[in-house]
Amino acid sequence: MSEKPASMYRKIDKPSYTRRDYVTGIPGSKIAQHKMGDLQADADDYPVQISLVPQEECQLRHGSLEAARLSANRHLIKELGEGNYKMQLRKFPHQIIRENKQATGAGADRVSDGMRQAFGVPVGTAARIQPGDQLFTAYCEVEQAAAVKEAFRRAYNKITPPCKINVERGETLLVR
């Protein structure tokens, strides 16, 4: 069975559903890692801090978070090298997504239960994003800032809400 479109889960219209100790059968997260680049470096070692900030409230599924992380990280590795930056994915997909499976095709009315016991089974997880939250943060040198901005531009093409790239620290260094 194929995955349902992300638009089914995008809006935050239900209470949070995160209690993993009560729910069985939750698929594992696709996110491979949350910290990338030079893991030993401290954030203060780099003069520039750039963040990707969504502008709308939504839920992002773990697959789209991983796709955005992969595209940004690959670009940074190619442009800057493995240990010349530090990047962090700041959101974790806690929200459990449920789906009431529906049978289709010939004889589906005899097999399917319709809306009886329609609570659904867990099919994945999502992160709840509020406007102004930092989704990704990267730390780099002044001359690497353009590559980080390009990496974040590639990342926000993989996710739904409109995003802004904020220079959190070192903005005066970039103006020169």
From Swiss-Prot:
Domain of life: Archaea
One annotated Gene Ontology cellular component of this protein: ribonucleoprotein complex
Gene Ontology BP term (one): translation
Keywords annotated in UniProt: Ribonucleoprotein, Ribosomal protein
A matching Pfam family: Ribosomal_L16
Presence of the UniProt keyword Ribosomal protein in the record: yes
GO molecular function: structural constituent of ribosome
Disulfide cysteine pairs (residue numbers): none
Family recorded in the similarity comment: Belongs to the universal ribosomal protein uL16 family.
PANTHER family the UniProt entry points to: 60S RIBOSOMAL PROTEIN L10
NCBIfam families: PRK04199.1-4, PRK04199.1-6
This protein's name: Large ribosomal subunit protein uL16
